[in-house]
């Protein structure tokens, strides 16, 4: 996974990538640390690029996307939010949404 360091980088992704996953985390978040490797393993099964952001380092992204809890997983497709989960990630549901997106491509 690649790190997003600023809001402009995120905007560029929206413009250039058809489909991608964004994982938002915060420092000292034990759930974030536990879920991160699971997200990495899951996304390897698909050909979607994946990015992560430390929500404290990019406050503009946090505000623009209403990312007020962590962890958060958002799937983007065609420049729009397709699916979002926050705090408690339902990996079965996330997998279903990734499958759904993989057939759309």
Where in the sequence are the language-model features?
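Non-catalytic, surface beta->alpha helical segment in thiol-disulfide oxidoreductase systems
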Residues: 77-105
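Structural micro-motif
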Residues: 65-74
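Local sequence-structure signature of Cys/Sec-based thiol-disulfide redox active-site neighborhoods
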Residues: 9-41
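Thiol-based oxidoreductase modules, predominantly thioredoxin-like and allied folds used
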Residues: 4, 24, 43, 47-60
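Short acidic active-site motifs
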Residues: 6-10, 57-62, 93
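Hydrophobic beta-strand anchors of alpha/beta hydrolase catalytic cores
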Residues: 20-22, 50, 73
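N-terminal leader/targeting and pre-domain segments
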Residues: 1-20, 97-99, 103-105
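CheY-like receiver
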Residues: 12-13, 61-64, 82, 97
